[in-house]
């Protein structure tokens, strides 16, 4: 049968990324307790396309994914990327995996246990060498220092999302990264709180007011102190409770030299 993708394209323009996006797929992730979490990810797969070809073979991406269906885990990403390059005749391959990850957390006073969900991502690219980025989105509470200073009865507070992405030399557990991030807001979030816990986290937030600027600077200071990390970016969005907009701040550090 005719292969339209291999036909020449007269415009002769190379494409940096082409492929399939937003595939829902089961994966396996090991947690810090050395147990396996089975979760469902959204997967994006791309390769570059040389200027002389009209199109890529979209079906091959899914075939590759299916072939590794029992092995889609962190230590298998480079193997998948190598196969993408080989099967699709490309110089570079890219794989993005976003998934929910659960951590067993205890309430701060009662000790009540519950699962807390965090949105995580693996982003991997392969040309000559592997480039891997770990990302986590962590919900926090932020309490406004200005409001606390001005108001007689309390201060406005809101939920915030801090997104941290890191490149590292040696393996970092998702749990350790989450724990670091949760120290950067006014208070962590919990899935389950009893009354004694609710009192504690409310007072903790009030005694630890943070602007969005404070939060990214705190994360920067903590991440910069980890020599294992070669690059990081931090973004924080505060979903303001007294405004019809969000507050936002971002920082980045690159030590790859």
Swiss-Prot record:
It is an enzyme of class 3 (hydrolase). This is GTP cyclohydrolase FolE2. GO terms for biological process: tetrahydrofolate biosynthetic process. Disulfide bonds: none annotated. Pathway: Cofactor biosynthesis; 7,8-dihydroneopterin triphosphate biosynthesis; 7,8-dihydroneopterin triphosphate from GTP: step 1/1. Signal peptide: none annotated. GO terms for molecular function: GTP cyclohydrolase I activity.
């Amino acid at each position: 049968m005719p292969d339209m993708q291999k036909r020449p394209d007269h415009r002769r323009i190379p494409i940096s990324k082409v492929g399939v996006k937003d595939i829902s797929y089961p994966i396996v992730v090991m947690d810090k307790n050395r147990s396996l979490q089975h979760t469902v990810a959204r997967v994006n797969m791309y390769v570059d396309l040389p200027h002389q070809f009209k199109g890529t073979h979209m079906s091959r991406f899914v075939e590759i994914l299916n072939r590794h269906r029992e092995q889609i885990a962190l230590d298998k990403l480079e193997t998948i990327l190598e196969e993408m390059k080989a099967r699709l005749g490309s110089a570079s391959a890219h794989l993005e995996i976003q998934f929910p990850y659960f951590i067993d957390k205890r309430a701060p006073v009662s000790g009540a246990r519950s699962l807390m969900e965090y949105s995580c991502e693996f982003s991997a690219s392969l040309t000559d060498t592997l480039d891997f980025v770990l990302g986590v989105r962590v919900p926090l509470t932020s309490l406004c220092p200005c409001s606390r200073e001005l108001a007689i009865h309390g201060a406005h507070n809101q939920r915030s999302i801090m997104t941290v992405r890191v490149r590292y030399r040696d393996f970092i557990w998702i749990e350790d990264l989450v724990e670091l991030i949760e120290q950067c807001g006014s208070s962590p979030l919990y899935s389950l709180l009893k009354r004694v816990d609710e009192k504690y986290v409310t007072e903790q937030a009030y005694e630890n007011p943070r602007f969005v600027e404070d939060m990214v600077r705190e994360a920067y200071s903590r991440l910069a102190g980890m020599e294992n990390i070669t690059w990081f970016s931090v973004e924080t969005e505060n979903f303001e409770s007294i405004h019809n907009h969000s507050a936002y701040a971002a920082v980045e550090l690159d030590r790859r030299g």
